[in-house]
């Protein structure tokens, strides 16, 4: 997902420019200038400077591009039979991961690359401009390394998820040793993050702690799948290891909420200054597909926890890349305001990936908000305001998309 462009572009007559900057500005009759890959200026249309190219937004809304901080794009096959069984009343368990692992191992590098590339294109066509993807359907050294290498060529952020499930026939402790040793070494050149599925039927608290400790010692940022199927140790582990995010968070005790809120006590939401805490990443499309309770996004926000929304595209529990669907669900079912939901799907995702601030972090500009110096990732709607995302559920409202200053839709 890379492109360059050195010309300047001026977009005027923006009906609503939802910046998602630290001031939460929403500008009316606005304009924005893109130079190369960065935002060079934004303000009122009447004050707009000249540029090489001029685009009239005709009153449409412009948002930051979606930042999808949780997906599983490196896979082959599907699990429609599992979905149908679940809709008929069977409960979700993590066992279907093994089905996808077999299908993924069976395809060539070229075919797996094509599949990932097609999924990225689908996401971009709906306004996603920054994408994370995990490994986790290889589950041996060779195939996890292959998944990481392919993902690194196609998405913005790669997360190592060898600790997704213990493969059939493997000893859990021996497999955890593999995840913490040779498999970790094999993926390191391609990944920035490590994750663990800390849940019944997957990895125990002690096994998860070993995985997180090994990944931290290897210099990787940390993420946790936790509290999806019931209350458990996932949130506490994420807090203990200062993980960037804990994802799913469907079942939270009061203690879990307080612990997450405590990680944000030293961070100023008005300026972004101070020590960041652990983001709670909500995955509403997954919750609907698995018929789990929706994550308590409203409660988390009210407690002072920063949240993200992500699509969790995967073949078993959330086969969608539609961030707009997640925003709609957050507004209609999770009781977030439109502004809160859009912020969680843009700035919140950037926060969960450590890409929310600074103009040069590992060679990447800040994403998830619209401000001078940030990467020019824009999502223009076929509507005058972001409210239409929830007001008109299911309607494809993406009009135009710019990624790193290049118009891609």
From Swiss-Prot:
Reactions mediated catalytically: 4-imidazolone-5-propanoate + H2O = N-formimidoyl-L-glutamate
Protein name: Imidazolonepropionase
Entry cofactors: Zn(2+); Fe(3+)
Keyword Repressor: no
Assigned EC number: 3.5.2.7
Cofactor binding, per record: Binds 1 zinc or iron ion per subunit.
HAMAP family from the UniProt entry: HutI
Residues binding Fe(3+), per UniProt: 70, 72, 225
Pathway it works in: Amino-acid degradation; L-histidine degradation into L-glutamate; N-formimidoyl-L-glutamate from L-histidine: step 3/3
Chief localisation class: cytoplasm
Record-stated family: Belongs to the metallo-dependent hydrolases superfamily. HutI family.
UniProt GO cellular component terms: cytoplasm
PANTHER family: IMIDAZOLONEPROPIONASE, IMIDAZOLONEPROPIONASE-RELATED
Species name: Paenarthrobacter aurescens (strain TC1)
Lineage: Bacteria, Bacillati, Actinomycetota, Actinomycetes, Micrococcales
């Amino acid at each position: 997902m890379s492109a360059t462009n050195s010309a300047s572009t001026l977009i005027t007559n923006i009906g609503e420019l939802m910046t998602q900057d630290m001031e939460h500005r929403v500008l009316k009759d606005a304009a924005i200038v893109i130079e190369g890959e960065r935002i060079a200026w934004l303000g009122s249309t009447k004050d707009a400077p000249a540029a090489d190219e001029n685009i009239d937004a005709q009153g449409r809304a412009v948002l930051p591009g979606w930042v999808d901080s949780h997906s599983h794009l490196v896979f082959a096959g599907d699990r429609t039979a599992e979905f149908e069984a679940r809709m008929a009343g069977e409960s979700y368990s993590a066992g279907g991961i093994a089905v996808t692992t077999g299908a993924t191992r069976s395809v060539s590098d070229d075919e797996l690359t094509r599949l990932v590339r097609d999924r990225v294109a689908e996401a971009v066509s709906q306004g996603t401009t920054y994408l994370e993807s995990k490994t986790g359907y290889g589950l041996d050294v060779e195939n996890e390394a292959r998944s990481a290498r392919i993902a690194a060529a196609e998405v913005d952020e790669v997360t190592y998820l060898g600790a997704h499930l213990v493969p059939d026939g493997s000893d859990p402790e021996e497999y955890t040793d593999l995840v913490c040793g040779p498999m970790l070494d094999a993926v390191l050149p391609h990944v920035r993050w490590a994750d663990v599925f800390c849940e019944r039927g997957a990895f125990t608290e002690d096994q998860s702690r070993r995985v997180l400790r090994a990944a931290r010692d290897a210099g990787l940022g940390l993420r946790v799948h936790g509290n999806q199927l019931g209350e458990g140790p996932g949130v506490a582990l994420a807090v203990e290891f200062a993980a960037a995010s804990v994802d799913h968070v469907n079942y939270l005790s009061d203690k879990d909420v307080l612990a997450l809120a405590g990680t944000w006590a030293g961070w100023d939401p008005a300026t972004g200054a101070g020590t960041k805490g652990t983001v709670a990443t909500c995955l509403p499309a997954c919750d609907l597909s698995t018929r789990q309770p929706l994550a308590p996004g409203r409660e988390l926000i009210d407690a002072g926890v920063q949240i993200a929304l992500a699509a969790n595209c995967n073949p078993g529990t959330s086969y969608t890349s539609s961030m707009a669907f997640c925003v709609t669900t957050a507004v209609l079912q999770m009781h977030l305001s439109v502004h809160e939901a859009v912020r969680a799907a843009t700035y919140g995702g950037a926060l969960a990936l450590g890409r929310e601030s600074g103009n040069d972090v590992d060679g990447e500009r800040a994403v998830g908000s619209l401000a001078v110096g940030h990467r020019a990732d824009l999502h223009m709607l076929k509507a005058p305001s972001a409210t239409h995302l929830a007001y008109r559920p299911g309607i494809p409202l993406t009009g135009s998309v710019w990624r790193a200053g290049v118009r891609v839709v």
